């Protein structure tokens, strides 16, 4: 949303004077892509390779759970080292309280990270129950679609891939899940 806000404010409204027409067109096209991700719309699908190099499809993964949390993180990010395990603990509690099964599609959103650093992060924080770990690498279309230019980020989808929450937090996840229950009654 922050990236979209900047494009809207400075490019779309004409405040930016140093970019040429072609550069502005590219950014406006990106804005259109970002704005396609609306709550209750089908999420932009992601197919990325896991730690063993096998492609993992987000929507197919999501079908195995009541809900799936899409997690963008960087193993070297200090904030991620706190927030990702905190979200994992929150999910464990919510699964018991709400009697739901929540999958975690965790995306390593780091440009220059070694496979060992990536796997060490997963193991050190015990991020293994109902997880698929994939790496984003330099995939800009996915990064743009999810406005994943900061870490960590959390998105919530249902088993059909409907986007229920964007950029949520461990604090707000319970509210988002209860809201999803009420919407489908």
Predicted regions and their residues:
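Structural microenvironment flanking redox-active thiols in thiol-disulfide oxidoreductases
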Residues: 82-124, 138-143
